[in-house]
Amino acid sequence: TIYIAKDYEQNLREIEHQHQLSEDPSIYVQNASVTDDTLAPRGKSTLYVLAPVTHQHPNVDWKRERSAFRDRVIRQMAKAGFPDVESRIEYERVVTPDDWDGKYEVFRGATFNLAHNLRQMLHLRPRNRFEDIDGVYLVGGGTHPGSGLPVIYESARISSRLLMQDLGVSIPASYSSDFFRDETQIRIHHQRRPCSATAVT
């Protein structure tokens, strides 16, 4: 479920340009236990709620704002068709840009990494292999093809294929995860150059 702020363009300006928390934030709510009943006990749900906010910025003190913004998101959930959520919460975890930066080393807590616009999406993101420096590879949400966990996995697959090609590793055109469990199938013919990898989340 997506709840879009009444003034969506203003909401985007607050995130991208003004670097402030919106009084009317857009939110995304997912209940994964609807399709996977192993995620919660019978009759209960797991809710994932995303409220896009600015990256770490002096305008937002998350130590001071965390609780109030969390309450604001709960109120937005009622507008999106989820009334009385507060009284039914048994466990919750609030993750802010400070947490993404401090605990998970996501630069400035920006989970979408580069600007999330058409000029910095898909093939317009930095490539997975440096063109100017031999043996340097990038992987993560800041590289091609973009952010979001499934897409970051694809970035890892692209970068690992490029690395293996450069190392002269023979791999089938299409392979499963079982391929890597049997190390005898991996044959390194030669190493063309030293390699390094950098995670860019």
Q: Locations of the language-model features?
A:
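Mid-domain catalytic core of redox enzymes
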Residues: 1-40, 179-184
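Generic recognition of stable, solvent-exposed alpha-helical segments in well-folded globular domains
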Residues: 24, 64, 68-72, 106, ...
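Conserved FAD/dinucleotide-binding core of flavoprotein oxidoreductases
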Residues: 41-76
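A conserved FAD-binding loop/helix module that cradles the flavin
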Residues: 141-164
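Active-site-proximal substrate-binding core of FAD-dependent oxidoreductases
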Residues: 164-199
